[in-house]
């Protein structure tokens, strides 16, 4: 997120610091293993869709080689009393997103993603709106399948996540290996069943 100028996230390290940390993690883990989350997108009297897209562009240009995916959400202030109270207490006049605004933002974000050559996979976190026409998919805020792919050999973590790592079956008479359609292959002839049922919000 980039709300440094507005001071909306007090106690959070500076944007420059967070970007450098992100790049460092990406170098160690690989750019497919580190996901950029801009969560949530907030509208106020001083933050418009144009402003949000400028913020996204600034970060995206810096992270284009450090990640493959951007996950975002729209701030639903009315559903979170504490957030609503904090904004009002700090005299921050917020605006709620409606479907028209969400659609406009999604369209322009997808256009920016293509125009600037980022080619990020775009996904929402905990949103009901369907904006797949812009190539934006529903996503979990925390991707359990990605965690499993990165740490499948950590038996304690897999037990906590209730993920069963299974051995690939032997080939059939015709050389085919049959696994469930929602199975995800792992190294060492292992696989697991995806827990990633599309997030409907």
Task: Report each predicted region and the residues it spans.
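C-terminal accessory extensions appended to soluble enzyme cores
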Residues: 99-201
